[in-house]
Amino acid sequence: MEKYNKLRIEWDCRRGMLELDKIIMPFYLKHFDELTDDKKDIFIRLLASTDLQLFSWFFNRGKSSDSEIQSMVEYIQNVQKITTN
């Protein structure tokens, strides 16, 4: 039995903002399986955030107060080559 319900995670990757869909889903499809279990757990916690929080974090308008979540945001930005300059 798989530890992670991938259908549920994929569903949670679908967001209400196109900008987030273009960041989160491609990351999930391409990189989720490469993550350690700890990082997978953090990614799943990240998905519980609101679209407004995610937008703020991914587009450098704020930072998560949770350092693990913030590190995951920065990792995704780096891997997805997101720049907001």
Curated annotation (Swiss-Prot):
Localization in the cell: Cytoplasm
Main location: cytoplasm
Biological process per Gene Ontology, one example term: succinate metabolic process
Coiled-coil features, chain-numbered ranges: none
One term under GO cellular component: cytoplasm
Record-linked Pfam families: Sdh5
Keywords annotated in UniProt: Chaperone, Cytoplasm
Highest taxon, organism lineage: Bacteria
Function: An FAD assembly protein, which accelerates covalent attachment of the cofactor into other proteins. Plays an essential role in the assembly of succinate dehydrogenase (SDH, respiratory complex II), an enzyme complex that is a component of both the tricarboxylic acid cycle and the electron transport chain, and which couples the oxidation of succinate to fumarate with the reduction of ubiquinone (coenzyme Q) to ubiquinol. Required for flavinylation (covalent attachment of FAD) of the flavoprotein subunit SdhA of SDH and other flavinylated proteins as well.
Family: Belongs to the SdhE FAD assembly factor family.
Protein name per UniProt: FAD assembly factor SdhE
Originating organism: Haemophilus influenzae (strain 86-028NP)
Gene of this entry: sdhE
